[in-house]
């Protein structure tokens, strides 16, 4: 029986490399997968998943009006698994579509993304995945400043912490830092 999985972690926790690894493992066995990602993430072009270690792969871009259930239903061949990158950027209706893919089409869905933003608030997609997922798993990494587990994302601008602003600002290592709670509130930026 298929399930909806939500695997979340902070920046630099290896979420995208995990997607690429899972896809590779399925495909090595001759089992087709569908990789999807939010069209909001434009760092490496719309419709691509790419890891910080340099691996990159084309994916179906999810726009605000994308009908995920309809898209999967209309594929010529039923996939063995659906893999979603940047799931935090999904809209409520996308997450409900993913649940229907699992329940109605019996296709497992693995969604990967951030749980909370730089203000330590849930993203829309994360909120609904936490509500609907059959299994929730944290992908762990460590704080950039100490050896504690990173649970938060610190946004920086020219080396200074930022706690206010638009929720979504696309950026990478130059903008976002994985940190523990202590260093979220008292970042060690200059050390």
From Swiss-Prot:
Uppermost EC category: transferase
PANTHER family cross-referenced by the UniProt entry: THYMIDINE KINASE, THYMIDINE KINASE, CYTOSOLIC
Entry annotation: catalytic residues: 86 (proton acceptor)
SUPFAM superfamilies reported for this sequence: Glucocorticoid receptor-like (DNA-binding domain) (SSF57716), P-loop containing nucleoside triphosphate hydrolases (SSF52540)
Catalytic activity entry: thymidine + ATP = dTMP + ADP + H(+)
E.C. number: 2.7.1.21
Organism field: Streptococcus gordonii (strain Challis / ATCC 35105 / BCRC 15272 / CH1 / DL1 / V288)
PROSITE patterns per UniProt: TK_CELLULAR_TYPE (PS00603)
Alphabetically ordered keywords of this record: ATP-binding, Cytoplasm, DNA synthesis, Kinase, Metal-binding, Nucleotide-binding, Transferase, Zinc
Protein family according to the UniProt entry: Belongs to the thymidine kinase family.
Name the UniProt record assigns to this protein: Thymidine kinase
Gene Ontology CC annotation, any one: cytosol
Statement: the UniProt record of this protein carries the keyword Cytoplasm: yes
GO biological-process terms attached to the record: DNA biosynthetic process; thymidine metabolic process
Subunit note: Homotetramer.
Domain of life: Bacteria
Gene that specifies this protein: tdk
Annotated TM spans: none
Annotated compartments: Cytoplasm
Residue positions binding ATP: 9-16, 85-88
GO terms assigned for molecular function: ATP binding; thymidine kinase activity; zinc ion binding
Coiled coil: none
Signal peptide start and end residues: none
Binding site for Zn(2+): 143, 146, 180, 183
